[in-house]
Amino acid sequence: MQKGLTIYLNGKPLSGKRVELLLSDNTIPYHTEGRIDSVRYKLIAGLGGIGEPKLSGWYIYCNNRLVLEADTSSITGWGVQPIPKWHINYAMFRGVLFLDSEETLNLPLTTTKKGIDATSEVYKAILPLMKNGMIKVFEFLKKIPQMGDEANDYRAMLWENTPKIGAVELKALNFSNAEKIFVAPPLNTDVIARKKNTVRIAYDVAKQTAETAKEHAEA
């Protein structure tokens, strides 16, 4: 478990995979925090890993209890204008919302305390902030497929070469940049080539020349 704080899911200590976001000088999550009535909130939206799309979505903690995990439903704004429904192109999206109150009854929990009450006035006030964070991150994620064959290499390179931070650390982190701004990493195929120590060269040659080169390579 992440040091200094125990996270619970349905009353049990959570020992599963860490919720991690990329954080570096040129990759900084969207974030905002404040208070609505007696509820304190801290919201972070950014980039996570690839290869496990089921981990994509929103994670909502109420008094350090995880009540919504990897949610991509309308409860967290997905598929509700102007937010699109979840798509594999958004698999790197990670959103984390921390809600804290001295009075548990003031938190936007369902009667079973195992989910989020989307009709709560507190939650309805925060949802637009969540959507704004999604829009900022999606603007970047929508550009990656335009890289064509390099898209997956770029996603992998980001995850492998960018420092990461866990949910607990995020809650305690004092961000140095302004609120409600997502700092996206550079979208540059040359970066991928340098990381791979290779340069991709593509050009057309006559068929006979290509066959001759192939014969020499196989000799």
Predicted feature descriptions by range:
Residues 25-219:
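Charged regulatory segments coupled to nucleotide-binding catalytic modules in large multidomain enzymes
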Residues 16, 20-21, 73-74:
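A generic structural motif
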Residues 15-16, 68:
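Flexible loop/turn segments at secondary-structure boundaries
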Residues 1-9:
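ATP-binding catalytic core of ATPases
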Residues 12:
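Flexible loop/N-cap segments at domain edges
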